[in-house]
Regions:
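Cysteine-dependent hydrolase recognition
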Residues: 8-341, 345-349, 357-359
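Low-complexity, Ser/Thr/Pro-rich intrinsically disordered linker/stalk segments at domain junctions
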Residues: 326-395
Length: 395
């Protein structure tokens, strides 16, 4: 059951991922589809009006010039409230600025050090595998994700999936595919370690095959192939992350290879692809282990995916940014009795601290409880009339 506002203000949980107030939505007012997507997203996710950024520019192309982007970026920076940590971009085209992806240009500003010349390494992201939950505050960067799709119906379905995934603790599988495509299979060397690191967290299958079909439990699907067949036979759970390591997947609307949009159309909630030939550096693509670890901590899709790419300059992130399938859930099950669901990628301890005043001091209320890998159910008593305030923390 939902609990009273009084109980919500008296029981505090750790912040595990972005909230609606942390996201600014960027709309192109000259693009009717962008307006429709942005307005629906604001309404569906309860994004504050102050976080809505409305621009005007021509959308009839895939690539924006550096000069044009820098002018837009000045406006975006001016209109972005200081507290905002990330951007949701309400269009599909343009998806690229010069040699950079639009999402990385928004995060870092346009700078050619984030692009590869002659297959050289590019500038790294300080956000890679970072514990930070406030990238704008800690690193002066705001990760971005595109609410991408070829029709309003598609993007609406994507947004609705993201919302449906929140606190849902899906019991899905992680599929890590080692394919016959040598140039695109370089993530496979890390799969065994990933399986070890995430044992007991997600059911994980490492398969030596080019594709899977007829599975209805897909939560993660990481592969390396120019075209991924049989997507229409799969059932993706709300919140699913999926991508195919290939050089042109991020060319959303005009790729000669499979566009990353096909993952979203098939039912994934977020995906990733590169917008220019990146050379086959694994650092330019998501690390499955890092993405799954941060997702399991309760991070949002945009945080987990962004943290999984070491060199994201040429890569575009698409999907529903705020999807949080593993964020903790607190429920009142009876008067004075609560149930907390916590998902964790590691073992730890839960501390319940109590104070008669909201300002503290908080003292240990009961013996710390063990948190195991995966899903944990914790029950506790709390009388909001007499017990003051509780602070729940785990590591």
């Amino acid at each position: 059951a939902a609990f009273s506002v009084e109980a919500q203000t008296r029981i505090s949980l750790p912040h595990t991922g972005f909230m609606p107030e942390d996201i600014a939505v960027i709309i192109n007012e000259d693009d009717p589809l962008s307006r429709q997507i942005g307005n629906y997203y604001q309404q569906a996710r309860h994004i504050p009006e102050i976080n809505m950024i409305r621009l005007r520019f021509s959308s009839e192309r895939s690539v924006m010039t550096r000069k044009e982007f820098q002018q837009l970026k000045k406006n975006i920076d001016r209109l972005t409230p200081d507290h905002v940590q990330a951007y949701a971009v309400a269009w599909t085209s343009p998806y690229r600025v010069g040699c950079m992806s639009l999402t990385s240009a928004l995060a870092f500003g346009f700078d050619e050090k984030y692009c590869s010349k002659k297959c050289a390494p590019t500038a790294p992201s300080p956000y890679f595998n970072a514990p930070s939950q406030y990238p704008a505050t800690d690193y002066k960067l705001r990760p971005a994700m595109m609410l991408a799709g070829t029709s309003f119906e598609q993007v609406k379905a994507l947004i609705d999936r993201g919302i449906a995934s929140d606190h849902s603790f899906p019991k899905g599988q992680a599929y890590l595919l080692s394919t016959s495509d040598k140039a695109r299979n370089n993530r496979a060397t890390s799969y065994a370690q990933t399986a070890k690191d995430l044992a007991g967290v997600f059911p994980l299958q490492i398969l030596e095959t080019n594709f899977i079909s007829d599975r209805q439990d897909v939560l993660f699907y990481f592969t390396g192939l120019t075209e991924v067949p049989m997507l229409e036979t799969l059932g993706f759970l709300p919140g699913a992350l999926a991508d195919h390591l290939t050089s042109a997947g991020g060319m959303l609307t005009d790729s000669l290879q499979m566009s990353s949009l096909r993952w979203l159309e098939a039912g994934a909630t977020a995906s990733y692809g590169t917008v220019t030939e990146p050379c086959s550096f694994p650092q330019k693509f998501p690390s499955p282990a890092v993405a799954m670890f941060h997702y399991a901590l309760g991070a949002s899709a945009i945080e987990a995916y962004w943290k999984s790419v070491a060199w994201p300059g040429q890569g575009v992130f698409i999907g529903e940014p705020l999807a949080k399938p593993f964020a903790p859930l607190l429920r009142k099950i009876n008067p004075g009795r609560y149930e907390l669901t916590v998902f964790s990628p590691r073992e730890g301890r839960l501390r319940i601290e109590k104070s008669l005043s909201a300002a503290g001091p908080f003292k240990l209320h009961s013996r710390p409880q063990s948190i195991r890998r995966g899903k944990n159910l914790i029950h506790f008593k709390f009388d909001e009339k007499t017990d003051g305030y509780l602070k729940l923390q785990w590591n």
